Structures are given as structure tokens and as C-alpha cells.
Amino acid sequence: MTSVVVVGTQWGDEGKGKITDFLSADAEVIARYQGGDNAGHTIVIDGKKFKLHLIPSGIFFPQKISVIGNGVVVNPKSLVKELAYLHDEGVTTDNLRISDRAHVILPYHIQLDQLQEDAKGDNKIGTTIKGIGPAYMDKAARVGIRIADLLDKDIFAERLRINLAEKNRLFEKMYDSTPLDFDAIFEEYYAYGQEIKQYVTDTSVILNDALDAGKRVLFEGAQGVMLDIDQGTYPFVTSSNPVAGGVTIGSGVGPNKINKVVGVCKAYTSRVGDGPFPTELFDEVGERIREVGHEYGTTTGRPRRVGWFDSVVMRHSRRVSGITNLSLNSIDVLSGLDTVKICVAYDLDGKRIDYYPANLEQLKRCKPIYEELPGWQEDITGVRSLDELPENARNYVRRVGELVGVRISTFSVGPGREQTNILESVWASI
């Protein structure tokens, strides 16, 4: 029984797809356990970029099983489109498995998402308008439609009719918006269900059987800990639990079967959307990091907000997600800066604090306390070991590990597979 969970430790976009792809080489099953197509991950193989939003990164290994777990909310339209994209690129999807218990995103979820966001005005959350939140709302309200329902024509028709009648009343009476047509949705989405039914199964059985047989299973989280609905910067969060604990709920695997948790972070910080960001940069340094790091959302295309590395955030993530190993990405983006900074604590109304407040008004008043380190000018994208890094870059990597309190297992100096450097093998340490 061997399993590793990969979680983002910041606000998403940390490079989880790259690290999952890297760790997938030694895994036999790769599974997603939460989120939906609001999460984008980019994988670079032989210089070619592949951008996925729903299908696990492990799909590029045809001999390995890729699982979309029950905790994921699935937009069948997006899934069919992504499958076609992979097929056009010559990538087989015969190794994909989709949980019959996963909930379905339908057009009324997306419309409701847009209407709710518009109604918030200046208090908007910054949602990707993918229908994720409304789909999880229906799930919690016990009126959601699951993949198993989508495949049964009569059940799908009955539940869609009931749900759509309620949603249309909401659209017309509360939002003065156009109602949606039952027949159009039913025909389109039932057809999508028939296209994906070959992949649908009880994925909890597949995952547990694999673990019981001693196979290596890798769980791939979406978003990041700071977007977790319980542990993140609520309400500026996603609607699921990206923390490692979400694995057990979203995959049907017990907590006693989780061995290691790899926290993925960048050598700086970024986030898409609104919400607190204590170390955010608004100067030319921030603009430089954004441009060099190509900080634009995979899903939205929006410019990401960027800032210095925040060890307060990272220690919070380590604690609530049980992180055992750290993967530090995008060190190369900081090359060329005379000075690099790490936030070590916050100043809250004249008092130093080492924790991340839950109160958003307090967070607004938090001022980062920085430790400054000398930067490095060298191009490090070709570095293949820690010893090859310039001394100042090595010191930066070591200091990050010290402040977070977790050993760094890998560090990356670029987006390619070959640019990920191993300091300690996660699989070998189990």
C-alpha cells in the first residue's frame, strides 16, 4: 500500500500539474479528488504544452489508470471537448476512469454562477463562472444529478425536469433572466453521457483494489489550500476541499491509506481573483515577475496577482494539510533580481503574529514582515542539481525549507520535466 497526495499550498497555479506529471512516472494509478474544470494545469512533454482542466495529468501515461473521483464535479460538455482535444493530439484515453458518484455540472449551474457573481457587484468573489459553486450547492442540498443518473435516460429526465423548473423560477423571479429549455439540455447532455459512459465505473473499488495490491497511487489536488472552503481565505475560496483531507471524501479511500503529502509551491506567490493577499506587489518588481513567470490563468487567461513568498501562508498550509514533503517551483523566475524577500511574519496593529488570521478585516491590516536575501543574476534554467545553483539561490531554497518547516524534495527551474531536480525521492521514502 503506497500513496502520495499532491496539494497546492498557495492559491493555486503552483505547478501541481508539472509535479503530478513528474511523480506519475513512478505511480500506477493517478486520481483527482475534488474541483472541476475551473482548475487548469499545464504539462510540458518534449517541449510541447498540453493544457487540461478536468482530466488528470496521468492521462499521458497510457499504461497507468487515470481517475476522476466522486468528489469532482464534472461538466460533461467540457469533458467531451477535452477528450477530443487529447485524441486530436494522438493521446489515448483508454486508461481514463470516471466515478459514477461524481456530480454533474449543467447549464443552469453556469447561468446561476454568472447571475450570482453579477449581483455581488463590488463584493464579487472572482469565480471562474464554470458552475462549480452552484453544482456543489445542489450536491449539499441533495438535489444534484450524478454521473450514474446522467446515464439513465428516465432518471436523468425526471431529475432534470424537477431541478430546471426550480432554477427557471429563480432565474425569472429573482434575477429577471431568461429561463432555460428542458428539451435542449436533455438531448445535449444525455448525448454527452453516452459518449463518456465507457469510462464510468465505481472508482473507489479501483483505487482501493490498487492500494490493497501494493500498487502506487498518486492523488492530484486542484486549486490550493488557501482556496479550501474550510481552511482558505473564506469567502474568497473554491467550493470544495483541496487540502489532503479531501482525498478521503473525494476518492472513497480511507485516511489510513495515505502515506505522504507533497505540498507544491512557487518561489513567490500568485493568485487569481479577489481576496486577501498580504505580500502582493504593485510595483515594477511585481510586473517583472508576472511577465517572466507568464502569470496568466490557464482557465481564465486573467493576469494573476503576484507577490513575495509568504512563509506564514505556507506554515498554515503545512499544518492543515499534513504536508510531509515540499516541491519548490519557478525559482528561475526570480533570477536577475538584486534582492529577494520572504515574508516571515505579519504586523497586525503593531503586534507581530506568526499565524494566518481568519478575520478578513484583520487580514487587510496585516503588513508583511520581510527577511531580505541577496538575489542572483545567473540563468539557472539548465541547472540539474542543488550544487549547480548559484550560492544565493541555494541559500534561498534552504531558507524556504527552514521557514516552512518541511524538507524540500524537489525544486524546479523551468516548466519542463527535465527541469525538475530531485533532492529526496518521495516514493523511495515510503
Curated annotation (Swiss-Prot):
Binds 1 Mg(2+) ion per subunit. Its cofactor is Mg(2+). It catalyses: IMP + L-aspartate + GTP = N(6)-(1,2-dicarboxyethyl)-AMP + GDP + phosphate + 2 H(+). It is found in: Cytoplasm. Mg(2+) binds at D13, G40. GTP binds at residues 12-18, 40-42, 304, 330-332, 412-414. InterPro entries: Adenylosuccin_syn_GTP-bd (IPR018220), Adenylosuccin_syn_Lys_AS (IPR033128), Adenylosuccinate_synth_dom1 (IPR042109), Adenylosuccinate_synth_dom2 (IPR042110), Adenylosuccinate_synth_dom3 (IPR042111), Adenylosuccinate_synthetase (IPR001114), P-loop_NTPase (IPR027417). Signal peptide: none annotated. GO terms for biological process: 'de novo' AMP biosynthetic process; IMP metabolic process. Substrate binds at T298, T299, T300, G301, R302, P303, R304. IMP binds at D13, E14, G15, K16, N38, A39, G40, H41, T128, R142, Q223, T238, R302. CDD domains: AdSS. Pfam families: Adenylsucc_synt. Its EC number is 6.3.4.4. It comes from the Bacteria. One of its GO terms (molecular function) is magnesium ion binding. Pathway: Purine metabolism; AMP biosynthesis via de novo pathway; AMP from IMP: step 1/2. One of its GO terms (cellular component) is cytoplasm. The active site is at D13, H41. Plays an important role in the de novo pathway of purine nucleotide biosynthesis. Catalyzes the first committed step in the biosynthesis of AMP from IMP. HAMAP family: Adenylosucc_synth (MF_00011). Homodimer. NCBIfam families: PRK01117.1, purA. This is Adenylosuccinate synthetase. The gene is purA.
